[in-house]
């Protein structure tokens, strides 16, 4: 087995989201938090239904949760929370304060940041633009654009209306874009 390069100390682990999730499991089930990834991993393998349902609840996912599961012998074919529905944009934009949401740094070092509030406002403007132009659920929006803040906003707005987003960055080069 390869040598471990780094491991967080106990204090850092105590402040982690993973440990918060373990404490959440402890409140709901007979699970004792140990700040031990392997123990948690083994619990998830033994309790996949409880795990996936707990991830949904712990993450405060907004949507319609269906507790239907399919666990065949071939783990790669497993399905969890089958037919559950959520909107990525609705969940992402539930934060609307002035804390940093997105940071863009170009190859040349140009840096730009926006807050959750700005991300929400800009995304709402794009949603209105899409609606005014009769773009609707299952329509496709394709972009040839750099991975910058406006691209993120466009993706979120597309998701919010149920359209399908596809983008390709110019740094793929002409052949990469064509393929």
Predicted regions and their residues:
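Conserved AMP-binding/adenylate-forming
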Residues: 79, 129-172
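Acyl-group handling in specialized metabolite and lipid biosynthesis
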Residues: 35-41, 75-85, 105-114
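Charged, compositionally biased N-terminal leader segments and the immediate start
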Residues: 1-25
């Amino acid at each position: 087995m390869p040598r471990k390069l780094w491991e967080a100390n106990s204090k850092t682990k105590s402040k982690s989201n993973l440990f918060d999730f373990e404490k959440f499991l402890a409140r709901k089930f007979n699970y004792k938090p140990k700040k031990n990834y392997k123990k948690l991993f083994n619990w998830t393998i033994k309790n996949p239904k409880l795990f996936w349902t707990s991830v949904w609840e712990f993450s405060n996912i907004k949507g319609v949760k269906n507790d239907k599961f399919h666990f065949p012998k071939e783990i790669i074919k497993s399905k969890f929370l089958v037919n559950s529905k959520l909107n990525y944009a609705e969940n992402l934009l539930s934060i609307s304060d002035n804390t940093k949401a997105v940071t863009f740094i170009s190859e040349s070092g140009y840096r730009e940041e926006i807050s959750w509030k700005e991300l929400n406002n800009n995304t709402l403007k794009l949603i209105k633009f899409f609606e005014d132009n009769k773009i609707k659920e299952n329509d496709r929006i394709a972009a040839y654009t750099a991975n910058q803040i406006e691209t993120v906003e466009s993706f979120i707005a597309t998701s919010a209306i149920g359209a399908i987003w596809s983008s390709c960055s110019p740094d793929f080069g002409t052949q990469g874009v064509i393929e």
